[in-house]
UniProtKB/Swiss-Prot annotation:
The lineage of its organism: Bacteria, Pseudomonadati, Pseudomonadota, Alphaproteobacteria, Hyphomicrobiales. This is Large ribosomal subunit protein bL32. Belongs to the bacterial ribosomal protein bL32 family. The gene is rpmF. GO terms for cellular component: large ribosomal subunit. The keyword Ribosomal protein applies.
Amino acid sequence: MAVPKRKTSPSKRGMRRSADGLKAPTYVEDKNSGELRRPHHIDLKTGMYRGRQVLTPKESA
């Protein structure tokens, strides 16, 4: 069974754990509609992605 040769220092332990924290999701303002959307995602209000119409938006009821 593998056993560590040296004790992990608090600094190394902290560096390893630094990637474990949750980050708030990022949003960008859409150029056409002004709505907030996730980057690299389709704008669900307009159905546009990178300047192209990729899906037809649902009609608001």
